[in-house]
Every structure is written in structure tokens, then in C-alpha cells.
A protein has these predicted regions:
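Aromatic-residue-lined binding/catalytic grooves and analogous aromatic/hydrophobic interfacial grooves
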Residues: 50
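Solvent-exposed alpha-helices and their adjacent loops that cap or buttress functional pockets
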Residues: 1, 24-27, 46, 93-94, ...
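Internal alpha-helical scaffold of NAD(P)-dependent oxidoreductase catalytic cores
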Residues: 5-42, 55-92, 137, 141
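A short acidic, helix-capping loop that chelates divalent metal ions and anchors anionic groups
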Residues: 1-5, 43-44, 113
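Short pre-catalytic strand/loop immediately N-terminal to key active-site residues, enriched for Gly-Thr
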Residues: 39-45, 97-102
Length: 141
């Protein structure tokens, strides 16, 4: 869908022209970011493995909506659109995701209750642990 993000690690003999060419080629598939080689495992885990985690999140959002009575097809559409729109907002604004989250959470509202429930379930720690597991597996390969 041309919406991925590729890591580019120029070799020691690469010129600026080589790097620019590589970036142009990789950007034909989405975004491309130049990183030092030591960050390749983290980039691979974040860009390469995370789609599976996002799919699981979309599925869980939809399952919650189905449990509340929404037909599954509509639930998937709502969930996927919410995730896509949220990601686009982070990319377009450059704002910290936590700031954007705070903007959506009304005091005493439904969203902050959902955030609290996610925190009780160690949502962020679970996601961070998944990335760490991917990085460790990549290092072992």
C-alpha cells in the first residue's frame, strides 16, 4: 500500500549520491529513513513485525465493538479507519503520540476510562516487550 517505512544503512564506501539513489528507490514503496547499522534490529522489529501487532489491535478493537452489538464488518471498518487516521495524524503533525492521546481524553470521559483499562492490562509494557522479543530474536539469527 506504499505506506511502509524502510531502514537504509549506507555502507562505508557509499557516496552521498549512492545514499540519495537508495533513498529514492526505497521511498517508492513508502518512507525511508537513514539509520546507523546498530539500530537495524530495532527498525526491523518496529517496521517489519509491528503490522502483525497492529492487525491484532484492530481485531481486538473490532471484537470489543462486536461484543457491544456492532456487526463484525462494520466493526473492522471502524477499527481500521481509526488506526489509519490516528497514524496519519502522528505523521502529519509530528506531535508526540502522548499529546494526541491527551487531546482525545476528556476529563472523566469514556476515552480516559478506556486508557485506564488498557494501563491496568499493561498495554504499553506488552507492546514494548513484543518489540524487545523481536529484537532479541533478530540478534540470535
Amino acid at each position: 500500500v506504499n505506506a511502509g517505512c524502510a531502514a537504509v544503512v549506507p555502507g562505508p564506501g557509499a557516496t552521498e549520491a549512492d545514499e540519495a539513489l537508495c533513498l529514492r528507490l526505497m521511498e517508492s514503496f513508502g518512507r525511508a529513513i537513514v539509520i546507523p547499522e546498530r539500530l537495524m534490529d530495532a527498525a526491523s522489529a518496529t517496521a517489519g513485525s509491528s503490522p502483525a501487532f497492529v492487525f491484532m489491535f484492530i481485531e481486538a478493537l473490532a471484537d470489543g465493538a462486536v461484543a457491544a452489538g456492532m456487526p463484525r464488518a462494520q466493526a473492522y471498518e471502524f477499527a481500521a479507519a481509526a488506526v489509519a487516521g490516528s497514524a496519519q495524524l502522528v505523521l502529519e503533525t509530528g506531535r508526540h503520540p502522548g499529546d494526541l492521546k491527551d487531546m482525545v481524553c476528556s476529563p472523566g470521559g469514556t476515552t480516559i476510562e478506556g486508557v485506564r483499562a488498557l494501563e491496568e492490562g499493561a498495554f504499553r509494557a506488552s507492546v514494548m516487550n513484543a518489540i524487545s522479543a523481536c529484537v532479541e530474536k533478530a540478534k540470535a539469527l
